[in-house]
Amino acid sequence: MAERVAQALGFHYLDSGALYRLTALEALQRGDPLDDARKLAARAAALEIAFRDGRTWLSGKDVTAALRTEEMGVAASQVAAHPEVRARLLERQRAFRQPPGLVADGRDMGSVVFPDAPLKVFLTAAVETRAQRRHKQLMEKGMYAKMPDVVEELRKRDARDSSRPVAPLKHYPDAIFLDTTAVSVDEAVAKVLAEWRNRAAS
């Protein structure tokens, strides 16, 4: 959804979760344990990444499909729980803010990475709804997944992200709360664009 908003506004787009997935992928490929915060932070600082034409590249290799597996989502959540890793990736994320603007997608974008953002939106939906959407995305990309497994992994991720000591997942008062359980992607995009234009006009 955030990418659709960025396209509509002609802004740059940051998928912050991809940076944590890339760190996790690099660590797993090199056999690093995901509980070694110091080593993970070093990997995060040295990542050779590029985003081109909707694809993600790591050290010159297209890793787009590998990043979108459920396994990598779980690994990324584990990696993101380490304050050392978050600190290393903070400046890399902030470097994406370039004219004419940026739409950043991530669980701590408004609270930590861009606390001065002119518009913050806290997106949520029932876990079952998010699981259905995620399952559809995976199947469309040819990645088989069982619905109960997707639901369970989302619940675990929510629990981890809400309880981590640094940048826990929660709704902050200065962010618009948008529940998309019964709202289509098109409707959600329209709501965010309308809010942005209202603020720009005021």
Regions found by a protein language model. Name each.
Residues 1:
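Hydrophobic positions on the alpha1 helix immediately C-terminal to the Walker A/P-loop
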Residues 4-70:
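N-terminal phosphate/diphosphate-binding loop that engages ATP/GTP or pyrophosphate donors
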Residues 16, 20, 37, 41, ...:
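Amphipathic alpha-helical transducer elements in NTP-driven molecular machines
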Residues 64-143:
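ATP-dependent NMP and nucleoside kinases share a basic, alpha-helical "lid"
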